[in-house]
Swiss-Prot record:
Molecular-function GO terms, alphabetical: metal ion binding; ubiquinol-cytochrome-c reductase activity
Binding site for heme b b566: H97
Cell compartment(s), UniProt: Mitochondrion inner membrane
Protein name: Cytochrome b
Subunit and partners: The cytochrome bc1 complex contains 11 subunits: 3 respiratory subunits (MT-CYB, CYC1 and UQCRFS1), 2 core proteins (UQCRC1 and UQCRC2) and 6 low-molecular weight proteins (UQCRH/QCR6, UQCRB/QCR7, UQCRQ/QCR8, UQCR10/QCR9, UQCR11/QCR10 and a cleavage product of UQCRFS1). This cytochrome bc1 complex then forms a dimer.
Lineage summary: Eukaryota, Metazoa, Chordata, Craniata, Vertebrata
Cofactor: heme b
Amino acid sequence: MTNIRKTHPLLKIVNSSFVDLPAPSSLSSWWNFGSLLGVCLAVQILTGLFLAMHYTSDTATAFNSVTHICRDVNYGWVLRYLHANGASMFFICLYLHVGRGLYYGSYTYSETWNVGILLLFAVMATAFMGYVLPWGQMSFWGATVITNLLSAIPYIGTDLVQWIWGGFSVDKATLTRFFAFHFLLPFVVAALVMVDLLFLHETGSNNPTGIPSDSDMIPFHPYYTIKDILGFLVMLTALSTLVLFSPDLLGDPDNYTPANPLSTPPHIKPEWYFLFAYAILRSIPNKLGGVLALVLSILILAIVPMLHVSKQRSMMFRPLSQCLFWLLVAVLFTLTWIGGQPVEHPYIIIGQMASVLYFLIILVLMPLTSIVENRLLSW
């Protein structure tokens, strides 16, 4: 008798995706982040669902409803901080996942890569709208500053901003629609994840060497299921530690002050995971130029496959490219630090230099280095 997992119409899909899926035998822990992102999404949807049961999306009561969740709801504080810090964990896994893709040349699977970029934008939009919901000072002013950037679009900019706001400033209508979209988008993300996996399973996984591994495959279960479960435990332990010992470590104290349109905080900044893009935005004195640089800092990932001129897929055997990759990582850390600093000397010039270097490494230095490495190979 054939096993039910191979014959049942629904279980057959699960079986071919998670049980009998052929996977390269050499996958390292860097390949854990896809499944970790799935766990993060599940945690966010579950905690978000329970938070939405107690939250009210009205400017008069939003801040108090979050306080009520933390003080009066059974384990409401755990839900709230799991959700807030779960977002940080989500972005840590996202950035490591993208970094792994860049390092090992996974971007040559262009469909999977492009769906991944769409996912990145969707998660960023979701996180931004979620940050507005507690209706603290940083929520209000962050929403005002970031949505206002759209006014830089020629001709339709101002109308577009007012259309998003639902009025002439960030107010009740804005908060209500942001809550609606914040609730909806994670399910769009979940659907995109299915599409991402569909494309990935068409080609199969890449591996650290970048060499086709069709001749050396092992079943996903039990080898990689066990490996993934270890990843889950490590990540959930880190998340629990953060939530239980230092839940406000990554937050902004200004968000414990209710939103006040008449009082601007001294330093308006987004959550830490957007600081690198915010630093690039601020480093250009022109408003439209800054907005374009902000969008391009993420969208640049879409042209990375076109800039791949190396004869080797992975950076595993390309020491010069490795040096550039880690320089890029250092530049991103620098930008994240600068994004959280006030706009004054010497932070301005450091931010501008780091921004130029960011684009220079990806657009010019990496392709040139690949050409040099190709020449070295043929010697």
